[in-house]
């Protein structure tokens, strides 16, 4: 997650858990326990542990750790049965090589190159409508003594993406689904920006009815609490969020904490992660994430600190969102 913080925002980060208690979802609407129907917590944990391991050295974009991450994710894409997008939409194919979508960006004063991974699954019946699921795999890398594991940010989201892909492979959707492990989110959302630009230039974007972003879904600040950003843009948000809570035991809350007093400004969650380029392109989006916690962007964001049943519940909720009938995605 790339945190865009307005003046004096760090004060608010310390009180976000308290703010969450005052969000619109009341306690009685939240389940007493996590309910899982298909998510496998052992596989989720295995994927996180690999991505957050010392061998991958924090997965900084452009490093050997990032290359090793892609090798692992490519193997997982193939195991699941995801297909490269190259043969589906010819205008987009020229930017792709297998699962890889390469792009250039400027990191500080240096030219840099990133690589997104894209795999797709066809709908149960032929359709031109697409849904997207995105989770960034890059993190901060190795800075000084030790590396930044990035277990919650964002190995948790990538592990959930893989779990959802496996589920959809077993039980196809009525929509084509594109799964994106994006690169260079941390330095400035460069992977998602490049991808959205390619989708627009190729004409692919007009076929997308929903993009779901998973970024930091492993450490609930309150029991079973997850923010689902994007509620301002969906007429039926309250209806489908209530259904997701009933089915998973999650406490789903709109991610709009109010400022307190005159001096505290709120986080700009709109620009905080890979959903923002989709927003700029006019593509409907929803974003699952937890607030920044004490281990955010530290060497202590490790795999052993995560709540894997919680990640599984978020994965199941996101999978249900990707199956929503288009009529439920109407804007306010």
Labelled PLM ranges:
Residues 182-287:
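Metal-dependent peptidase/peptidase-like ectodomains
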Residues 30-38, 54-64, 104-108, 145-154, ...:
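Second-shell loop/turn segments in exported
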Residues 293-332:
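His/Asp/Glu-rich mid-to-C-terminal helical/loop segments that flank catalytic regions of hydrolases
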Residues 119, 133-188, 318:
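Alpha-helical metal-binding/catalytic segments enriched in His/Glu/Asp
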Residues 51, 77, 105-144:
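Acidic/His- and Gly-rich active-site-bordering loop/insert found
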Residues 59-121:
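A non-catalytic alpha/beta surface segment that caps or lines the substrate-entry region
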Residues 20-22:
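C-terminal motif of bacterial Sec signal peptides marking the signal peptidase cleavage site
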Residues 27-68, 80-86, 100, 294-301:
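N-terminal capping segment at the start of a domain
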